[in-house]
């Protein structure tokens, strides 16, 4: 298979006019017709990473079909960082210095996004991550706002992901299935450290005693010993934090007939290809996600899913929803700035974001909030959903207002009888 150079451009939107001036050089609006260049850094070999670049292309095409931003087309400059922090940084640097992007959308991997963040500060480049979850991304902005203010967190922080899973666990696992205990099983990665810290705090409050806490190497290939250890502690459910891995633990969970529900965050399970990837072993798996096919979180959700499926043949991963919204949010910020792409004015406009996208209502936390420039979490904003794989399809099982199915488990999973 042909291997591209780490920072190689994969494709871009056809645009007209000359390339706009370098970011930070011109504080005013560019000439009408000049393209607005947005860099998109993804991971093409990963399910979530490929969804970033694909969704961005759909959003840009839609915006351009409607006349662009006050007559100026969006031009995407797309890179593949191959899930490497160093390659991600090189792509980020090239986006600013050579390709003259006005903003960067980049990476679902926390280690990669955290490596890019200092360059966002140094280059004064507006940067929004559509999938990385580490609390440290927004914590850096909070702790040194003037330096890091160019970074925005376009996905839920690890703390909010954990809280969403705890809210689901309380409403469904505890209240309906009367479960009382759980084992945490997370990959050892930057995003899961704060995730697990929050799990240890909020799962007991949700009604689930934590009887085991396992952090495993993402390179693990045999999960049998891990599942054996968990079973020996007799929890009612497994709460996961997995993204870099997904297929192998799911396949072994089914093959080993582990009699415990698999819930939590399984990022790879958020895409519709996961059924095929696991040969159906994902039946019954529950994961937090941004949305699910057929679930109208807002009037924009299903039209986007349909457009994505029509173009690419499968549904987007969670990063697809966020990236699609982010392209629109950047375009909206430039429009509200009367066309200016000055980085400080971009920051001001992004801070004033109030946008209803595919995932819900977007606003960012302020300078004095704990998670500065992170997505606001909670009712009326973005909470995510929990979906379950049932009969080869993803269905929404939480929250109640969006659910289109009730939780059911494979026959090998032993759970108490649910009550409505």
How should each PLM-predicted stretch be described?
Residues 33-35, 48-57, 66-142, 154, ...:
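Beta-alpha junction/loop-to-helix N-cap segments that form part of ligand/metal-binding clefts
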Residues 110-122, 199, 228, 233-256, ...:
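Hydrophobic alpha-helical
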Residues 134, 158, 250-324, 336-337, ...:
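Extracellular/periplasmic periplasmic-binding protein-like sensory domains
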Residues 310-320, 331-398, 420:
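Segments of small-molecule ligand-sensing domains
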């Amino acid at each position: 298979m042909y291997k591209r150079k780490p920072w190689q451009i994969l494709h871009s939107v056809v645009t007209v006019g000359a390339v706009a001036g370098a970011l930070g050089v011109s504080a005013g609006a560019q000439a009408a017709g000049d393209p607005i260049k947005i860099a998109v850094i993804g991971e093409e070999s990963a399910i979530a990473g490929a969804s970033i670049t694909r969704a961005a292309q759909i959003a840009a095409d839609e915006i351009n079909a409607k006349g662009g931003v006050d007559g100026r087309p969006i031009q995407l400059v797309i890179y593949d960082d191959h899930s490497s922090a160093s390659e991600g940084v090189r792509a980020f640097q090239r986006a600013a210095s050579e390709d003259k992007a006005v903003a960067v959308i980049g990476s679902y991997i926390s280690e990669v996004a955290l490596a890019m963040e200092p360059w966002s500060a140094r280059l004064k480049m507006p940067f929004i991550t559509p999938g990385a979850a580490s609390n440290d991304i927004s914590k850096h902005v909070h702790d040194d706002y003037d330096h890091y203010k160019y970074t925005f967190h376009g996905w839920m922080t690890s703390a909010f992901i954990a809280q969403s899973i705890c809210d689901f666990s309380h409403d469904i696992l505890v209240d309906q299935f009367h479960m009382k205990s759980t084992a945490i099983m997370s990959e050892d990665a930057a995003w899961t450290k704060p995730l697990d810290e929050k799990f240890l705090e909020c799962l007991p409050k949700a009604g689930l005693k934590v009887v085991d806490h396992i952090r495993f190497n993402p390179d693990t290939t045999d999960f049998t010993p891990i599942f054996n250890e968990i079973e020996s502690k007799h929890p009612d459910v497994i709460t996961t934090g997995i993204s870099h891995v997904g297929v192998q633990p799911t396949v072994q969970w089914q093959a080993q007939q582990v009699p415990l529900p698999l819930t939590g965050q399984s990022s790879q399970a958020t895409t519709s290809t996961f059924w095929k990837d696991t040969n159906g072993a994902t039946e019954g798996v529950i994961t937090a996600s941004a949305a699910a096919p057929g679930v109208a979180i807002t009037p924009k959700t299903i039209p986007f899913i349909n457009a994505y499926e029509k173009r690419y043949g499968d549904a987007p991963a969670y990063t697809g929803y966020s990236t699609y919204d982010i392209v629109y949010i950047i375009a909206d910020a430039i429009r509200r700035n009367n066309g200016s792409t000055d980085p400080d004015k971009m920051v001001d406009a992004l801070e004033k974001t109030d946008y209803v996208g595919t995932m819900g209502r977007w606003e960012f936390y302020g300078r004095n909030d704990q998670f500065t420039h992170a997505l606001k979490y909670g009712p009326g904003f973005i909470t995510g959903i929990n979906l379950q794989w049932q009969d080869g399809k993803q269905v929404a099982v939480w929250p109640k207002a969006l659910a289109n199915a009730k939780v059911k488990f494979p026959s090998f999973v032993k759970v108490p009888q649910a009550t409505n």
